[in-house]
Amino acid sequence: MKNLSFLINRRKENTSDSNVYPGKAKSHEPSWIEMDDQTKKDGLDIVHVEFSPDTRAPSDSNKVITEIFDATEDAKEADESERGMPLATALNTYPKAAAWSLLVSTTLIMEGYDTAILGAFYALPIFQRKFGSQNDKTGEWEISASWQIGLTLCYMAGEIVGLQLTGPSVDLVGNRYTLIIALFFLAAFTFILYFCNSLGMIAVGQALCGMPWGCFQCLTVSYASEICPLALRYYLTTYSNLCWLFGQLFAAGIMKNSQKKYADSELGYKLPFALQWILPVPLALGIFFAPESPWWLVKKGRFDEARRSLRRTLSGKGPEKEILVTLEVDKIKVTIDKEKRLTSKEGSYSDCFEDKINRRRTRITCLCWAGQATCGSILIGYSTYFYEKAGVSTEMSFTFSIIQYCLGICATFLSWWASKYFGRYDLYAFGLAFQTIVFFIIGGLGCSSTHGSKMGSGSLLMAVAFFYNLGIAPVVFCLVSEMPSSRLRTKTIILARNTYNVVSIICSVLILYQLNSKKWNWGAKSGFFWGVLCFCTLIWAVVDLPETAGKTFVEINELFKLGVSARKFKSTKVDPFVVKNTPKYVSHNDPKGDIEASIAEE
């Protein structure tokens, strides 16, 4: 990492240079917007400036060029500093950024919790008798496959709507207020679930609650990636997966308690719904005091607020902190400016498919997240129901679910350690490979009806959960934040998550048909199907998923711009701040050529 004292000294030298001509009135210092207008008017991208030994005092126009040069140099220094920053230094420098990111991501606990209890309700006796029907052949009570599919479709449809509403809401009021509004609506919609007396009311409640969940899915990832440096990006984006698991673990514990103590009481399903009121208010208060994303503020031209936001994420004080703030703001400006020059329009959903570069980035982001569904993870969400249909007792099914989520949490922590030695693609691909093997073994055990094979298939589903949370589950949250451009990040993540939701709907329907005794009744033999689909996802990853570990946002932008193939991303080195073979330009305000600038035509 560049020595910070070097950056401070260079800044001090620049400050002293501004006082060389004490008799001259202080000239107007151009803002970034003015500098950007100047370069656009000339159709130039200033890269390098040279002053001859006998140069006169710079004019205002030439100071514009000098300021642009300094901003680009600052951006380069900040980018190099971020790329080489050790984890310990990042934690010491950005502890508040990490804390704010953890707070925002905690909203996902509620989604993981509620989606898990919905699947567990299907195995809860009181819920089965209250809302289900009796199987004439087996005499067992269960929720019909059509209603299970309907309830799943409702909350996923709500998430799709919520995600689409998140885009314009963020453009209008920012990340913080969008999250606060979503938390308010979630608390209100939970009343419908608590007072439900029919599956229809549950369907309405799930659909309405799905809208704020969709908001959480998008903004937790984008906020974490924008507020934290590269060294912390993997840990804080993948923390989203931990929040999902914490929510699912809480749900499994609550449902086991309901199955044990309230098996014949309406509290068995009302109490789990009521517990959703615990988090919205404290989270909303915390997020109200959180800093807004500096990337969002810079895109809105609110540079002073972006600096204040960055100051609130950094530790320390004095000149070192101010220089870090200035360098980071300059880097964000340069990155966004380079993206804006590709199009004059404000970022929209259509821009995600506008050209070959953005189409590729959008495709990879969408398929990357869809891989979480096609790898068989939806089966993990219905684990309690799966265990029961595989022949495991109801009480043991809930116990298996708790063990499964604990293994998932351990696996996610292990992925943090593994990320230091393996890349994003490595974890994604290796996780898929292991899951494929285990699914085929589960399918084979499903062909036997012995007690040992039933317990074996249940145990191996826990192995699937472990490898899933070691590989594809956490790394996806990091990858989807790195693939899009900063200008289109929120909208691309929304499209990707909605792709996941649509694919999840299809996978959920298939799983419910595979497990329901009135439909296909495959049981553990469904492992064969998910093994094949998981293998297909692995093939896509090998062909199309690039390695972004150790790459800053501006480097990733350049690699996509150059059309580097997926498997060469890791080995290709780029310098986004250098333009080669540039023609010469002499300023109109300096006809003698005292100031020479190397430029590149747009």
From Swiss-Prot:
Record topology, Extracellular segments: 128-142, 200, 256-270, 385-397, 448-459, 514-525
Induction field: By maltose and maltotriose. Repressed by glucose.
Family matches, as NCBIfam families: SP (TIGR00879)
Topology of the protein relative to the lipid bilayer: Multi-pass membrane protein
Pfam families linked: Sugar_tr
Keywords: Cell membrane, Maltose metabolism, Membrane, Sugar transport, Transmembrane, Transmembrane helix, Transport
PROSITE patterns xref list: MFS, SUGAR_TRANSPORT_2
Cellular compartments annotated: Cell membrane
KW Endoplasmic reticulum (keyword) present: no
Cytoplasmic side: 1-106, 164-178, 222-234, 292-363, 419-426, 481-492, 547-602
Role played: High-affinity uptake of maltose and maltotriose. Also transports alpha-methylglucoside, glucose and turanose but not melezitose or trehalose.
GO biological process: maltose metabolic process
Entry's family note: Belongs to the major facilitator superfamily. Sugar transporter (TC 2.A.1.1) family.
Cellular component terms (Gene Ontology): plasma membrane
Molecular functions per Gene Ontology: carbohydrate:proton symporter activity
Full protein name: Alpha-glucosides permease MPH3
TM stretches of this protein: 107-127, 143-163, 179-199, 201-221, 235-255, 271-291, 364-384, 398-418, 427-447, 460-480, 493-513, 526-546
